[in-house]
């Protein structure tokens, strides 16, 4: 029933963040890639593995920082047939009701995303900080992400399906690639949920979205 395991083994020991651990995915090179949130809303973390996307071998060895300066990297998904990693980012909560917005971004190895000083406001604090693919609602607790490239029909191809826990929204971010960069156009996708969190693509091409509050998993497939 999911409450007991015959055995378990800790393969990598990471710092504790403010919330739950971020997502974990298998990278094209065979490494595991995972998000680790900051231990606070706007402090400078003591550990280099906090507020970061980290990478390690499946047995837990060779722990590395993939990208840093991300307050809470939650959902992770690779764009199919590429090494382009899309990450949902929860931003700071101490700057007002409408600032800053959460982000969806393509994150590349070695990037520094500016937390806690840069949150998209521009100026010297954001010098050399990458730009997000799409800005989402403020304090939305953006969560899971899955990439569709035609499984739901040509009108919904090349899109990131993104869940916002706090707003109850599931959004579609239409992706356009220009060289190594992506731009995103945000559109509604699914309404009526309480607190959507995980978003997955099934082996049959359906988008699966889980509602944290109701315990219901919704399946959205091409008719």
Place the predicted regions along the sequence by residue.
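Asp-box/WD-like beta-propeller blade repeats and closely related beta-sheet repeat scaffolds
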Residues: 1-27, 35-40
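WD40 beta-propeller blade-start loop/N-cap
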Residues: 13-16, 68, 137, 191
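Beta-propeller domain segments
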Residues: 21, 38-43, 48-64, 71-187, ...
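A short, structured loop/turn motif at beta-sheet edges
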Residues: 27-29, 80
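Conserved beta-strand/short-helix segments
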Residues: 30-34, 106-107
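Short, flexible loop segments at boundaries between secondary-structure elements
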Residues: 197
